[in-house]
């Protein structure tokens, strides 16, 4: 496996969550996108459709946004009103990814490792895949990119029938420690040991 995130290095967990929230809200609430700091905080700390659930502070989110802005993964704008600073993602352009691949990465970063069928169902609001084989094709493409893999197919867990896929935006997924939580957390815990 090749580590993701290119020459800029891997993202931390909150940075990946912020990007995923921006991608999600671009599709699900287009009238409110780009997002304000408050709406981004609410999306990051949302209790539904998140694995794991966070309690990130405003200052933590601001620091992560600054890191993402320096990497050109987040853009700042003042929107139509010109009064409130708003944030938009730039992941697709930076990594040269189609919308389907961006949707899969966002879904994995929001909800943790998933099977192909779970990904198809959970990413439907972001991108409508024709069938499970098209999801698998995009995942294979993301796993074998010349610029570095952005996803990995995890080994089957005991008792499971299907492989799960995890994102590599935060670096290599820690295979033994990976039990459905975010690859970023597992990778971060391993690096702290």
Functional labels for PLM-detected ranges:
Residues 1-20, 27, 31, 65-96:
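Intrinsically disordered, low-complexity serine/threonine- and proline-rich regulatory segments
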Residues 1-7, 116-124, 141:
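Core catalytic DNA strand-manipulation module of type IA topoisomerases
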Residues 12-34, 96-113, 139, 143:
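Positively charged, polyanion-binding regions of nucleic-acid-associated proteins
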Residues 21, 64, 138, 168:
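Residues in the recognition helix of alpha-helical DNA-binding motifs
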Residues 29-55, 113-129:
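Short acidic, hydrophobic short linear motifs in intrinsically disordered regions
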Residues 62-65, 69-79, 139-157:
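A short, conserved structural fragment
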Residues 80-118, 163-192:
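Short, amphipathic alpha-helical interaction segments positioned at domain boundaries
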Residues 133:
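Long, basic N-terminal domains or extensions that often function
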């Amino acid at each position: 496996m090749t580590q993701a995130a290119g020459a800029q290095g891997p993202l931390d967990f909150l940075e990946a969550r912020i990007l995923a929230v921006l991608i999600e809200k671009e599709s699900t609430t287009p009238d409110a996108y780009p997002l304000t700091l408050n709406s981004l905080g609410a999306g990051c700390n949302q209790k539904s459709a998140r694995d794991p659930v966070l309690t990130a502070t405003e200052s933590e989110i601001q620091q992560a946004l600054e890191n993402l802005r320096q990497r050109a993964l987040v853009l700042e704008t003042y929107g139509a009103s010109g009064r409130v600073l708003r944030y938009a993602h730039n992941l697709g352009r930076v990594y040269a990814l189609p919308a389907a691949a961006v949707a899969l990465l966002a879904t994995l970063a929001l909800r943790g490792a998933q099977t192909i069928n779970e990904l198809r169902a959970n990413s439907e609001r972001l991108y409508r895949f024709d069938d499970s084989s098209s999801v698998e094709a995009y995942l294979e493409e993301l796993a074998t990119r010349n610029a570095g893999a952005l996803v990995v197919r995890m080994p089957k867990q005991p008792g499971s029938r299907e492989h799960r896929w995890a994102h590599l935006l935060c670096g290599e997924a820690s295979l033994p420690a990976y039990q459905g939580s975010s690859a970023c957390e597992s990778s971060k815990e391993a690096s702290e040991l």
